């Protein structure tokens, strides 16, 4: 056949981004995303591949910014009539089902929690698989929901953090599961969540850890002066004595959409923090405003003002620790890497 280059009409404005291009199920329809320079407007277009003509399908605006990277989930279903996308337009990242012309069929998920990632769509069974923070912002669990928005079911009831790899036919999934004191356990499960086989239990590491006196990582939340609830953790020495006064080292990252306070295996950094705890230093961490898993307003509160609210919240954290009867308030330090170094 002959190849012909066809320019697509993306509008007359030149100061913009065209960050994503997708084929729909129709070989003659190309989808592309257009964003303005400020990234507070996201437009989805469908273009005719033969003529280059394009049509605006959906336009989403925000007072702050539209987070394309976090909502990079546009998927055209094989029925050729509909597509699925995610959006934070109602304040939390949720899943939406649209007709090809952009009209909304339904919002599939809703609530004061986030869909952290889409895992798969079983079109034959009309089921959609996703991971969310519904149980807690400190956890990640795997769910299935019908495309009619009904029958939502939790597939991974174990508390902690689940990362999922699902087979292309949606009959099986591999679950990478961990908590703050349990290293990653990998299991093969059927689509109902039933465990079929343990692929890795990290038994050797667990046995090795049993030989060390490790302090427990405790999660907590506290209100700041303006009433914002912040999540944190504290690691006390294994031989903790509540009558002693301990120094505290705060660990911070705190960048937009990030998260340090999470019920998952912490790896080598946690072991370093355990080493400090063994030396008699309490290690503590607070996820300030601007961090993730708490919804759009919490994450975007630092927009165009990086460093201000984050610093206030870390100071609030330090004051919170200073009030603890076993803390020496004259010996509170802080360290951070990258954005945490900037903090």
Where are these regions (language model features)?
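Short, flexible loop/turn elements at secondary-structure junctions
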Residues: 12, 25, 34-36, 51, ...
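Serine-hydrolase catalytic core recognition
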Residues: 33, 161-343
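Multi-bladed beta-propeller domains
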Residues: 1-18, 47-72, 99-122, 132-135, ...
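A short loop-to-beta-strand structural motif that recurs across blades of beta-propeller domains
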Residues: 43-45, 94-96, 141-143, 185-187
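Structural signature of eukaryotic scaffold interfaces centered on beta-propeller domains
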Residues: 22-25, 70-79, 120-124, 166-167
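Beta-strand C-termini and the immediately following turn/loop, strongest in propeller blades
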Residues: 31-38, 45-48, 74-90, 108-109, ...
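Coil-to-beta-strand transition motifs
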Residues: 3, 39, 92, 181, ...
């Amino acid at each position: 056949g002959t190849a012909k280059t066809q320019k697509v009409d993306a509008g007359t404005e030149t100061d913009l981004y065209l960050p994503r291009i997708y084929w729909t199920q129709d070989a003659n329809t190309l989808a592309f995303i257009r964003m303005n320079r400020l990234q507070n407007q996201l437009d989805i277009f469908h273009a005719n591949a033969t003529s280059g003509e394009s049509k605006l399908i959906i336009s989403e605006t925000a007072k702050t910014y539209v987070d394309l990277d976090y909502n990079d989930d546009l998927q055209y279903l094989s029925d050729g009539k509909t597509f699925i996308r995610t959006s934070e337009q109602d304040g939390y990242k949720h899943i939406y089902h649209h007709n090809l012309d952009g009209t909304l069929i339904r919002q599939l998920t809703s609530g004061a929690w986030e869909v952290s990632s889409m895992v798969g769509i079983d079109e034959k069974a009309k089921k959609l698989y996703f991971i969310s923070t519904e149980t807690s912002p400190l956890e990640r669990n795997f769910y299935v929901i019908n495309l009619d928005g009904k029958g939502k079911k939790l597939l991974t009831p174990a508390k902690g953090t689940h990362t999922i790899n699902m087979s292309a036919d949606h009959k099986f999934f591999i679950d990478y599961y961990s908590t703050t004191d349990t290293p990653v356990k990998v299991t093969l499960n059927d689509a109902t969540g039933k465990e079929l086989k343990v692929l890795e239990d990290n038994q050797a590491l667990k046995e090795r850890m049993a030989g060390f006196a490790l302090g427990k990582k405790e999660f907590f939340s506290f209100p700041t002066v303006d009433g914002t609830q912040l999540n944190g953790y504290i690691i006390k020495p294994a031989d903790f004595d509540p009558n002693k006064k301990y120094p505290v080292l705060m660990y911070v990252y705190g960048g937009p959409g990030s998260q340090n306070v999470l019920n998952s295996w912490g790896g080598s950094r946690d072991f370093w923090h355990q080493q400090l705890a063994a030396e008699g230093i309490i290690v503590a961490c607070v996820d300030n405003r601007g961090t993730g898993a708490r919804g759009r307003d919490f994450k975007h509160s630092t927009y165009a003002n990086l460093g201000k609210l984050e610093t206030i919240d870390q100071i609030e954290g330090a004051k919170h620790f200073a009030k603890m009867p076993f803390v020496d308030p004259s010996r509170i330090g802080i360290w951070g890497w990258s954005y945490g170094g900037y903090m």
